[in-house]
A protein has these predicted regions:
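Alpha-helical tetratricopeptide repeat
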Residues: 1-107
Length: 107
C-alpha cells in the first residue's frame, strides 16, 4: 500500500515536471512523448493519445510516437486507426510494428 502511494506521488511529480517543461519549451517533442508514455503507464490512453498527437505534429517523422499511439489506440479498441499508426511506424523503421499488425489482422 505504501509503495503504491509512493509510486502515485512520484508519477504526479513527474507529470508536473513534464507540464513545466512543455510550458517553458512547447516545441520540445520529447516532453509530450514522455508524458504520453507516463499516461499510458497509468492506463490513461485518451490523454496519452492527445500527447502523442502533439509529438507527431511537431515531428511528423517520429516513428516511436506513431508506434506508441498505435498501441494506445489498440488498447482503446480503435483497431483501424491503431493499425494505421503501426503501419506508419513500420514505414519509418520500427519493423516489429508489422508483426503486431499481422497478429491483429489474422484474428
Amino acid at each position: 500500500m505504501l509503495k503504491d502511494n509512493r509510486r502515485a506521488y512520484e508519477h504526479e511529480q513527474i507529470m508536473r515536471d513534464y507540464d513545466m517543461v512543455i510550458k517553458l519549451n512547447p516545441g520540445f517533442v520529447y516532453a509530450y512523448f514522455n508524458r504520453a508514455n507516463l499516461r499510458c503507464a497509468q492506463r490513461d490512453f485518451r490523454a496519452a493519445i492527445v500527447d502523442y498527437n502533439e509529438a507527431i505534429e511537431r515531428d511528423p517523422e517520429f516513428a516511436e510516437a506513431y508506434y506508441n499511439r498505435g498501441l494506445a489506440r489498440l488498447s482503446q479498441g480503435d483497431v483501424n486507426r491503431g493499425i494505421a499508426d503501426l503501419s506508419k511506424a513500420g514505414e519509418l523503421g520500427i519493423y516489429n510494428a508489422y508483426s503486431i499488425i499481422k497478429r491483429m489482422t489474422s484474428r
